[in-house]
């Protein structure tokens, strides 16, 4: 049997949250040999959002070191040597298959045993696959999902070998929109397919979505709405050649990319800690129902102080900030001190083609569109506010400057009162910049 290893702190998972937790442990003075990161991936933590942006653009020839944590915030990049110098043990290519939280023991797929005093669950999410729904042919070659570096490498290789071929993107959310743009930029003929009446329906209003759909159409991307992929045709090599749609149509395809959502990976901890809304229930310090187990990033369901409700957030900004909060809380508790509870302002952003948008707050209540949302404008700039109980609770802005984006963030946190939707529509962005 493999030798048992013991650490004061163990982070399970090797994504963004894990990397930023390691960074904060170092900032808090962790001693060499106290901390280990155990990750299924073969590389140190990196900025996962880059996979659907810079990394997948073949002309850029971007390489991984550019995306190591903490490149996303302009911090020092954490190369493998960074962890070694800090005395942080990186245990890569290692999947934990069993967690006994009562015994504070983890077991890997090869039988290696790890003991800890404090555990941080940073296991992230897994992609939802079409095979999960029993879609015929969903395991064909050249059907891709994007979650990890290896996925991006396989996709990039296919994009190069199938240059000027036909690509079908299944899904109209974040991944669908970003990869649709990336595929087009890499000279593929792109069709997007999604069942909803417009793209990004969890965030976008119909007015916001109409701009992006128009912009993508002007770039030559074909959009098929209101139907789903119901099957795939393959050639003698098992490679996908067609996507069959539920409405009876078929689409030629050399490459298919699927982005239909993710699921938090919490099976290791099942029936050992409290769960809520699909994640591990935590307090405002990311401590679970077990005092020495913390959950950060995608897997944490935490108190959203601003809205007085429990939420789970899948986003890089929260992954970074929850990691920092948890580590600060752990170290403060050890010293008999306390820190303020997590007070998170929801934040989402995306970049595709020459576009760049940011959103802050909550997209609930009535919405008001302002600005120039004509897809054919040379420099489109528009936004939206969400109003609930006569207060502005959310704000979206496309094409904003850093100062303007900061203004909508401040607005979303301040939640100012508003006289009427008409006034807000007329004032537009100036309502935020004058707060």
UniProtKB/Swiss-Prot annotation:
Source organism superkingdom: Eukaryota
InterPro entries: FAD-oxidoreductase/Apoptosis (IPR050446), FAD/NAD-bd_sf (IPR036188), FAD/NAD-binding_dom (IPR023753), FAD/NAD-linked_Rdtase_dimer_sf (IPR016156), MDHAR3-like_C (IPR048618)
Required co-factors: FAD
List of residues binding NADP(+): 174-178, 202, 261, 314-315, 349
GO function term, MF aspect, one: monodehydroascorbate reductase (NADH) activity
Chemical reaction(s) catalysed: 2 monodehydro-L-ascorbate radical + NADH + H(+) = 2 L-ascorbate + NAD(+)
Binding residues annotated for L-ascorbate, in chain numbering: 320, 351
Expression triggers: Down-regulated by atrazine.
Residues reported in the UniProt entry to bind NAD(+): 172-178, 196, 202, 261, 314-315, 349
Keyword Nucleotide-binding: no
Record's keyword annotation contains NAD: yes
Modified residue annotations for Phosphoserine: 417
Documented EC number(s): 1.6.5.4
Locations listed in the record: Cytoplasm
Enzyme class: oxidoreductase
Gene Ontology biological-process entries: response to zinc ion
Keywords from the UniProt entry: Cytoplasm, FAD, Flavoprotein, NAD, NADP, Oxidoreductase, Phosphoprotein, Redox-active center
Main location: cytoplasm
Pfam families: MDHAR3-like_C (PF21791), Pyr_redox_2 (PF07992)
Task performed by this protein: Catalyzes the conversion of monodehydroascorbate to ascorbate, oxidizing NADH in the process.
Protein name per the record: Monodehydroascorbate reductase 2
Species the sequence originates in: Arabidopsis thaliana (Mouse-ear cress)
């Amino acid at each position: 049997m493999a030798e048992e290893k013991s650490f004061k702190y163990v982070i399970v998972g090797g994504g963004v949250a894990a990397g930023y937790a390691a960074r904060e442990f170092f900032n808090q003075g962790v001693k060499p040999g106290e901390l280990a990161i155990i990750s299924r991936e073969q590389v140190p933590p990196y900025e996962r959002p880059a996979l659907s942006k810079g990394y997948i653009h073949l002309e850029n020839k971007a390489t991984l070191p550019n995306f190591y944590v903490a490149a996303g915030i302009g911090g020092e990049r954490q190369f493998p040597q960074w962890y070694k110098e800090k005395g942080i043990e990186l245990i890569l290519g290692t999947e934990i298959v069993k967690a006994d939280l009562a015994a504070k023991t983890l077991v890997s797929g090869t039988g290696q045993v790890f003991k800890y005093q404090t555990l941080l669950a940073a296991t992230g999410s897994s992609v939802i696959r079409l095979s999960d729904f029993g879609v015929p042919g969903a395991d064909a070659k050249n059907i891709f999902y994007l979650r990890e570096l290896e996925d991006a490498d396989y996709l990039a290789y296919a994009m190069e070998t199938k240059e000027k071929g036909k690509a079908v993107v299944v899904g109209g959310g974040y991944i669908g929109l970003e990869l649709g743009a990336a595929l087009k930029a890499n000279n593929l003929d792109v069709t997007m397919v999604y069942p909803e009446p417009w793209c990004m329906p969890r965030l976008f209003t119909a007015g916001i979505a109409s701009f992006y759909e128009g912009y993508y159409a002007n770039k030559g991307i074909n959009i098929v709405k209101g139907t789903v992929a119901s099957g795939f045709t393959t050639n003698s090599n098992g490679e996908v050649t067609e996507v069959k749609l539920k409405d009876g149509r078929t689409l030629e395809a050399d490459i298919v990319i699927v982005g239909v959502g993710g699921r938090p990976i919490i099976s290791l901890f099942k029936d050992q800690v409290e769960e809520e809304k699909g994640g591990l229930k935590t307090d405002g310090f990311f401590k679970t129902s077990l005092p020495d187990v913390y959950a950060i990033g995608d897997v944490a369901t935490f108190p959203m102080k601003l809205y007085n409700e429990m939420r789970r957030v899948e986003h890089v900004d929260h992954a970074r900030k929850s990691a920092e909060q948890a580590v600060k809380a752990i170290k403060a508790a050890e010293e008999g001190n306390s820190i303020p509870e997590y007070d998170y302002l929801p934040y989402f952003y995306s970049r595709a083609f020459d576009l760049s948008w940011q959103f802050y707050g909550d997209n609930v209540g009535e919405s008001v569109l302002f600005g120039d949302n004509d897809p054919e404008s040379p420099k489109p700039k528009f936004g939206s506010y969400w109003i609930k109980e006569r207060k502005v609770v959310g704000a979206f802005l496309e094409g904003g400057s850093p100062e303007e984006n900061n203004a909508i963030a401040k607005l979303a946190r301040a939640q100012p009162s508003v006289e009427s939707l008409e006034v807000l529509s007329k004032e537009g962005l100036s309502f935020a910049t004058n707060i």
